Amino acid sequence: MYFRTEAAIDLDAAEHNFNVTRAKLPENVKLLCVIKADAYGHGAVPLAKLFEGRADFYGVACIEEAIELKKAGIKTPVLILGAVPKEFYSDIVKYDIRVPIFNLEDAKALSAEAVKQNKTAPFHFCIDTGMSRIGFQVNKESADACLEITKLPNICLLYTSPSPRD
């Protein structure tokens, strides 16, 4: 006889863990719940519905995951945590999905799509603070590009790829 591995999700336990985490944070701190990869196999939509109105953002890995949440009626902002090819910007704007912006060219393309759809496309600046993985470098050229981006009709928030602790 063969046995399948199965993950049983206790939504009461998930809610308890969420509440404990939220209670430890200052009120002014925003909470982003990462539910990429179908919440690591636990069900992104059920967890998103459970935390709806209490989580400040949901983080996902790709456009398909973000659209799934939006089509399920999730109103909490959804942020894709990695780069999104420009060919998906139409859906990004259509479904009001937030994306990280890594350069001026992408910001201009996203802004143009938002203008085309007569909508605002919120995005997050991605600043590289030491890992040299993703984001604007901390230098004058990047500062100038970020300043130019702020003149586009679609600005929202800031996030970073922090340095690891040594």
Enumerate the language-model features and the residues they cover:
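Conserved small/polar residues in nucleotide/adenosyl-binding loops
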Residues: 159-166
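Gly-rich Lys/Arg/Thr-decorated short loops/hinges at beta-loop-alpha junctions or inter-strand turns
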Residues: 1-2
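Glycine-rich phosphate/diphosphate-binding loops that line cofactor/substrate pockets in enzymes
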Residues: 22-27
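Active-site-proximal beta-alpha core segment in soluble small-molecule metabolic enzymes
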Residues: 5-8, 13-16, 29-158
